[in-house]
Amino acid sequence: MTDNIYIQTENNDKLKEECGVFGVYDFDGHDVASTIYYGLLALQHRGQESCGIAVSDTNGPKGKVLSSKDMGLVNEAFTPEHLEKLKGDIGVGHVRYSTAGGSTRENAQPLVLNYVKGTLGLAHNGNLINAPELRRELEYTGAIFQTTIDSEVIAYHIARERLNSKTVEEAVGRAMKKLKGAYSLIVMSPRKLIGARDPFGFHPLCIGKRDNAYFFSSESCALDTVGAEFVRDVAPGEIVTITPQGIQSDRSMASDKCARCIFEYIYFARPDSYIDGICVHSSRLTAGKILAQEHPVDA
């Protein structure tokens, strides 16, 4: 069951490039909405168009997901009263610039999908080049889309693969084999939090830990903000599953070739973040030095 209010706004198909994702699973049962809020504030530079939070209580009714999302900045969309209503010890958050689909309330994330096997929450940073093809395939088999974003295509494919998979993480892996493009995903089921990165590692995704809570984040700066320790980056092509039993890793989708987005280091990421072991600020200084050496000017 999902608590959402949708407001129709004018469509805007301008292409932009950034999004930020953040997820938490607190094994001590503490509510995570406020933590996600502060994580999203730290990732606000990655998306200022819309934002959202979805949570689930692992000790409550299975499959119940509470979500709230709106246009605008994080501190404008969420009041203390909003956060107080989002009760749950597992959750995902998202800040968005549209890469595919219009700038509307419906296209805000996280997406929450109810299907025959239960409920999924999904936050996605990236862009699929084969989204139109995958969308048509789903529509021909009866899928009805509520948004125009490729993130919903991913969610539908995960749900479909789940019908023939033993676990949600297996379904994520099977869906990834069909996806072409860039994606860093956080998938929430009622008892699991899953992070996945495309085989080329185009956009960042990292893991953090604070006491008995585990985190996924687009950037390490958000982990610092909530007092979490950086554990490691999610490897390109890796699926990381967090459950009360621990962390499981599947690298069967890993590729020998990485193709990271250079603009993460040049422009997108916050200077105090580390991406794949490289300090963003240091990378910018180094790039400037090399540029000056290769193209000196008289000044």
Labelled PLM ranges:
Residues 1-236, 241-299:
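Conserved short alpha-helical segments that host acidic/polar catalytic motifs at enzyme active sites
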